[in-house]
Amino acid sequence: MVRCDRGLQMLLTTAGAFAAFSLMAIAIGTDYWLYSSAHICNGTNLTMDDGPPPRRARGDLTHSGLWRVCCIEGIYRGHCFRINHFPEDNDYDHDSSEYLLRIVRASSVFPILSTILLLLGGLCIGAGRIYSRKNNIVLSAGILFVAAGLSNIIGIIVYISSNTGDPSDKRDEDKKNHYNYGWSFYFGALSFIVAETVGVLAVNIYIEKNKELRFKTKREFLKASSSSPYARMPSYRYRRRRSRSSSRSTEASPSRDASPVGLKITGAIPMGELSMYTLSREPLKVTTAASYSPDQDAGFLQMHDFFQQDLKEGFHVSMLNRRTTPV
């Protein structure tokens, strides 16, 4: 379900990117931003002797774009003229806000910048569909579309503000009452709405992909940690139970493995005397012939014979016990 929603969002983002760029390109390339009445279409029909046209005379209908004005009525019907944003008969203060506004209006920098950003954003959307694992491309596309929308709305605001000082030859009484916005203007406004929507969708896709990537990484980490040998170690209680059982088994083993021969031998001769007798033979190996004493040798042999006789008696008794013990 999530992949289906993401695929639908990606499809809407792609279609919206194409629509926003197309609308803005059509808007800046056509001359139907404004319908107004102007005297430019019949102004050349007058001579210097006739004087200026009547003050109350209404101008002919024109439609204009960002760079041209075209006549719908009058002598020059169907002809278009380049808009002169700085007429020679007007004296402008170069530090005034009106002069700066006319410069921005003449350059149309914001609509052009918006179109360029929309193009770059559309390319990023296409690259994001090809390289789906790179989320930064989709994020870059979202940022570009948001910036394009902001540039577009700034250009529209500047265009609306400059209508009071429209560069056509409208008279003062005609400036407020005889103009309407055309479909090119509305295409530009619609492009702003679509661009912002596409930007939000692109950022949302980036956030969802990033969340899914983090969840997948966390799940793989937990899976790897559960399969490690440290995760299979027994618990403290299990280790304690095993240690208790092993201690019990070690305590019970001597009683089962004890032999009567060993008990007889250890009970007959203390361990201290046995070690003493054993160590007493070592000096005989290192002594010289001059230190040989017959008395010491006779005592040693007597104790050695007693030890052998006692060992034989203990072994004989143990063998009798084994024979007489019923199975």
UniProtKB/Swiss-Prot annotation:
The chain crosses the membrane at residues 10-30, 108-128, 137-157, 187-207. It is a multi-pass membrane protein. Residues 246-256 have a biased composition (Low complexity). Glycans are attached at N42, N45. Residues 31-107, 158-186 are extracellular. Its main location: membrane. Gene3D superfamilies: 1.20.140.150. The modification Phosphoserine is found at S259. GO terms for biological process: regulation of AMPA receptor activity; response to cocaine; transmission of nerve impulse. Pfam families: PMP22_Claudin. InterPro entries: CACNG_subunit (IPR051072), PMP22/EMP/MP20/Claudin (IPR004031), VDCC_g4su (IPR005423), VDCC_gsu (IPR008368). Disulfide bonds: none annotated. One of its GO terms (molecular function) is calcium channel regulator activity. Keywords: Calcium, Calcium channel, Calcium transport, Cell membrane, Glycoprotein, Ion channel, Ion transport, Membrane, Phosphoprotein, Transmembrane, Transmembrane helix, Transport, Voltage-gated channel. Regulates the activity of L-type calcium channels that contain CACNA1C as pore-forming subunit. Regulates the trafficking and gating properties of AMPA-selective glutamate receptors (AMPARs), including GRIA1 and GRIA4. Promotes their targeting to the cell membrane and synapses and modulates their gating properties by slowing their rates of activation, deactivation and desensitization and by mediating their resensitization. Interacts with CACNA1C. Identified in a complex with the L-type calcium channel subunits CACNA1C, CACNA2D1 and either CACNB1 or CACNB2. Acts as an auxiliary subunit for AMPA-selective glutamate receptors (AMPARs). Interacts with GRIA1. This is Voltage-dependent calcium channel gamma-4 subunit. It comes from Mus musculus. The lineage of its organism: Eukaryota, Metazoa, Chordata, Craniata, Vertebrata. The gene is Cacng4.
